[in-house]
Structures are given as C-alpha cells and as structure tokens.
Amino acid sequence: MALNEGQIVTLAVDEIIETISAITPMAQKAKKYTPPAASMQRSSNTIWMPVEQESPTQEGWDLTDKATGLLELNVAVNMGEPDNDFFQLRADDLRDETAYRRRIQSAARKLANNVELKVANMAAEMGSLVITSPDAIGTNTADAWNFVADAEEIMFSRELNRDMGTSYFFNPQDYKKAGYDLTKRDIFGRIPEEAYRDGTIQRQVAGFDDVLRSPKLPVLTKSTATGITVSGAQSFKPVAWQLDNDGNKVNVDNRFATVTLSATTGMKRGDKISFAGVKFLGQMAKNVLAQDATFSVVRVVDGTHVEITPKPVALDDVSLSPEQRAYANVNTSLADAMAVNILNVKDARTNVFWADDAIRIVSQPIPANHELFAGMKTTSFSIPDVGLNGIFATQGDISTLSGLCRIALWYGVNATRPEAIGVGLPGQTA
C-alpha cells in the first residue's frame, strides 16, 4: 500500500537522523552548542564564547594592595553556510517509493560524511599537540602503545582540562598496525574473535577513554621550509579586549599569535613547528616540562609573518600581570635568531586526538516556518548525538508534475581549544 504524505516525510526524517547518528563517531566526540538565533543574525553568524579561566593565587595574611583582576578570555565560534542535498523528482520517479527512500538514505550518508570530514580536517590543521615518531607504527614491539601513550602523557602533563573525556582516532592503516598491540587479550595472550570480526580495540587505551578509527583523516604533506629562524625578540600576552578606532572595547581571539620569521617560504596551513628551547608548562603547577612546546601554523600572512596556535605566553615575561601570568603555557619568550623546527618532514596520514570539549559543533534550527515560505512544506529536525539541526523541505509544480526536495543541515565546526587537540605523525625521518 502506498504511503501517504505524512508517512513519507516521517520516514524520510527518521532515515536522516538514524543514518547520520550511526556514522559520525568523530562528531559525536565534540561538544555541541545551539547559540541564540537573534544575536547570531546580527553578528554574521559568529558568537564569542569564554574559555576556561586561569586564576593567580598568593600566600600571606596581609594582602593589602595585592588584589588581582579578572581576565576572562574568549574565542570566536561561527556557523558556515548550510550543507544541502537538493534534487528533483517527477511523478513517474515515485512509482517505486523505495527508490525515493534510498535517495534519502544516500543523502544522509553524504551529509554525515561532510560533517566527519570537517571535524577531521579541523583537528588535523588546528591540532597543536604534536606527537612524532621516526618509525612507522608496527615497526617495533609495543610502539603503538607508546605512540598513543605519548599523546596522553603530554595532555596529562600539560594539565589540560579533560572533564568531558578524551578520544583518539587512528587512520585505517595505522589502526590496522596498532590493533595487534592494543587489542585486549585473555590471560593466555589470545586475541578475542571480535577483534578480527569488527576491528574493535579495547576502550581506555593508554589513558584515552576511546580509541577509534576514521577513514576521513587527511594526509599532512611535508613542509618544504628550511633554515627558518625567529626575526626579532617577541612575546605575547593574553588579552580579553582591545580598543577599536572609536575607543570601544572589542573582543580578542586568544587562540592565535602572529610571529615574525626570517622567511615563510615553504610553510603552509597545518604545518607543525617548535622553537628551539621553548618548552611546555604544566598549566596549573607552572613546572617546565621535558617536551618541546609545539604549534600549528594557521595561516601564512606574508613573506615574513605566520599566524600560529596556541598563543605562546611565556612564564619568564616580566611584563605580564599576575592574572596574565596565570595563562602562561611556555617557559620562555621567542628570542631573535631562535631556530624554528619543522616537525612534519614527511608526508603522513594523520592520527588525531583531543579532549572532547576542544572541538565544538555550533548549529541552529533553520527558520523556514515563516509565512514567507508558505509555498513549500518543511519539517525541522535535530540530531542530538551530533548536535546538528536541519530541515526536510518539499515543493511541487503542477505544470510539470514534478517536485523539489531539499535536505539541509546548518552548522559550523570550531576548534575552540587547539591547545587540547593533537596530531600523531609516524614515520617522520628527514
């Protein structure tokens, strides 16, 4: 029996929600946020959100004239344009309703793919915690465990907030190589049947809550930059605002810093770098770690300037106020002629990891229920597990006995805490 219009719409929306929910593991490990609609309309779909505050403390009985200020930093998050599947059907295309439903399922799979690609690319390009190995995974015994454990070690040592959980995503090739090391065995060392059947690696590997895989992870091509140094001594401060041309306060995005170099030839977005002698700090204890501080190139500005993340705030910068020093994340400022180390020296398909609130999916319902759109039929839906909102819309044309169908998702993927997003690159031998 043929389905009526209401049943077709219900089935279509259910198909979209179920399909996208089933194949978006990366997006489901991100934080979700629905911003207020009216304010987004007046701000070009950008909203400023606070990041975790850092507080300076001090000992003593008498703290007269020692009060510190409140410094709350912000990051800009935004939504892009809707992602759509827009197609036309004629009456004779609907004689077999299952063909229509298969098209809906196909659209949902493609839209889910696009979400996962955006998360994967954002993590690979913005991830600033960099774990490299000179060997490919699987070269030595237990090197897969060490590779993942190194990532967890730096997150733990940096004292990064991990209250929402942590996740690690291998690319398929490295997942296959790592599986033998990381799959849970019984007391006799036997690998369970499930590991062969569905590629399952146990949960809570090397401190990560979930270790998964994704075929969406991009290749980070090697950087061809060589012999680059810092040009001039440079230091950076965390600031909540700056004054515009009219003397009014405007927010500052503290994820980024513009660094002056001797040259930028061969550098590109996503390159991973470090500076000689610049070490990470534990965020709370402010102890200097053994690991070099690592950064991601966000943008090549011109022949001598690059924008990097995170902003390096130096503990030894005497010009910092107490509340600014609480945000210090490296031991020392950038010095003139300091060597810049390129970390991605070989092409490699990325592995990525993050604290689960480091990436944020921002989405809003599409307001298509206004009377201006009375000529079409729309059904709004949300996908809570993925944090997405969308519409299923149809419109018929009596002159051609055809109808248009549009499935749209409106969202943006944002790296709100790039300091808590990392990239694993094996095989990095120059």
Curated annotation (Swiss-Prot):
Effect of L243A: No effect on phage production
Record note on what altering D385A does: No effect on phage growth
GO MF annotation list: identical protein binding
Region (Binding to the capsid assembly scaffolding protein): 2-56
UniProt cross-references to InterPro entries, sorted A to Z: Phage_coat_Gp5
Domain of life assignment: Viruses
Record flagged with keyword Nucleus: no
GO cellular component: T=7 icosahedral viral capsid; viral capsid; viral procapsid
Site (Involved in capsid stabilization and maturation): W61
Domain note: The insertion domain (I domain) plays an important role in the folding of the capsid protein by acting as an intramolecular chaperone.
Protein name: Major capsid protein
Organism expressing this protein natively: Salmonella phage P22
